[in-house]
């Protein structure tokens, strides 16, 4: 909640056009509630945050997929220090310094997003990572995303299309 407030307040102060999108799935989620740092809290665009420290795999994600990624790491019962999870917070600009620092450490990248696996923002982020950090990678950038289908209105079918913790 603090991130959303800080980003929205920053967007209101910008002279440029801004598209601010919130994920409805984060509303009323206990894990999304945070204390307000202070009334004047601002969060700069292009500044991600490291949510989980690790040294074998970098998971690059944002929005509701941050929590799903953390749940996936916990459900795999792997060493806590093997997966690094990065919350981008903003897609444009990207926090390239944070991404590079993490990939330098892990040499592997997995982009997790809720949009279609084909032509979604994760595909573009994976392409940017492959272009800029090819020499740092031990293999191809992998992606987890929604099945290539329109997202249905029925929540049961929606869960079949959108990425889940087990994916």
Model-predicted segments: where are they?
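Residue-level detector of structured alpha->beta connecting loops
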Residues: 15-16, 107
